[in-house]
């Protein structure tokens, strides 16, 4: 019980600091944001659709955190916590998207500034993949270890950290060296698509071998395949949205549907877990 109270306090503190940070960010740029909202067609629609998605994500993450706290013993490596963390980082990214989508079309936004704030957005995307990648690697490597007897748990942990490290290094390299916004928007998705495909394969592998009982790995795998398609579509829409923010609504609807499928996979147990 004491451990649960401590983690609830950590989450509350994290929420406070993140909320305060966004409050300062929006306050600092408030005048420019208001001008964009009043002058750019479709800006209000884009903001409203973003807020709706944030509300949906808050509900999803709250349900997953509630499931985590209902467990008799909780660990930060638990699937429910990592799934909840996945949606929590999505919330942070979505709030930042509202700021990003408005500020990039303001009169004072230079090409360098737009590139900088977009790179921050992709850093959030990089962090967002981490919780699910951790689950996929942990379960997949644990299954492989049953067949490879000469590799112990410590060595598999090093392999997992190595894979995560390579992922972070490549993502950071792409983000840092991207010279223009167009290069960033069109180059990074190629690598993220590879990660999504890897995650889909890992979850299909887990489902086939009945290794994940807290969630439906088959549904999650299908959702990540859908995420590949939505990422391609979103990249195209994002470039169009620089001139027409109302196109963000189309991207939001597509992403909400995919997020909901992922959420269903997180909360739905597979048939083999019910037997």
Question: Model-flagged regions — what are they?
Answer:
Residues 2-20, 135-175:
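The cytoplasmic-loop to transmembrane-helix boundary for the fourth helix
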Residues 43-60, 76-141, 245-260:
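Individual alpha-helical transmembrane segments in multi-pass integral membrane proteins
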Residues 176-186, 240-242:
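Membrane-interface helix caps and helix-loop-helix hairpins in membrane proteins
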Residues 18-32, 52-67, 78-104, 166-170, ...:
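Hydrophobic alpha-helical transmembrane segments of multi-pass membrane proteins
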Residues 8-15, 71-86, 151-163, 211-223, ...:
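Membrane-interfacial loop-to-transmembrane alpha-helix junctions, especially the N-terminal start
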Residues 8-14, 20-30, 195-275:
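C-terminal transmembrane-bundle signature of multipass membrane proteins
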Residues 2-71, 186-208, 265:
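First transmembrane helix
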Residues 1-4, 62-75, 137-152, 204-214, ...:
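Cytoplasmic membrane-interface regions of multi-pass membrane proteins
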């Amino acid at each position: 019980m004491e451990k649960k109270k401590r983690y609830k306090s950590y989450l509350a503190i994290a929420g406070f600091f993140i909320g305060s940070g966004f409050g300062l960010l929006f306050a600092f740029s408030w005048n420019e944001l208001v001008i964009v909202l009043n002058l750019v067609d479709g800006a209000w629609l884009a903001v409203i659709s973003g807020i709706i998605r944030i509300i949906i994500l808050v509900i999803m993450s709250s349900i997953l955190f509630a499931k985590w706290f209902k467990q008799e013993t909780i660990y930060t490596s638990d699937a429910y916590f990592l799934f909840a963390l996945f949606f929590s980082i999505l919330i942070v990214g979505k709030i930042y998207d509202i700021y990003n989508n408005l500020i990039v079309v303001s009169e004072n936004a230079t090409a360098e500034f737009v590139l900088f704030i977009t790179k921050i957005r992709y850093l959030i995307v990089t962090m967002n993949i981490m919780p699910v990648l951790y689950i996929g690697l942990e379960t997949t490597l644990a299954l492989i270890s049953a067949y490879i007897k000469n590799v112990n748990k410590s060595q598999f942990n090093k392999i997992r950290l190595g894979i995560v490290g390579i992922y972070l290094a490549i993502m950071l390299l792409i983000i840092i060296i991207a010279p223009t916004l167009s290069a960033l928007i069109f180059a990074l998705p190629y690598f993220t698509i590879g990660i999504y495909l890897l995650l889909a394969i890992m979850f299909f592998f887990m489902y086939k071998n009945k290794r994940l009982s807290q969630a439906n790995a088959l549904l999650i795998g299908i959702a990540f395949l859908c995420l590949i398609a939505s990422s391609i579509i979103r990249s195209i829409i994002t470039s169009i949205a620089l001139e027409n923010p109302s196109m963000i609504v189309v991207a939001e609807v597509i992403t909400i549907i995919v997020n909901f499928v992922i959420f269903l996979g997180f909360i739905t147990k597979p048939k083999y877990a019910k037997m």
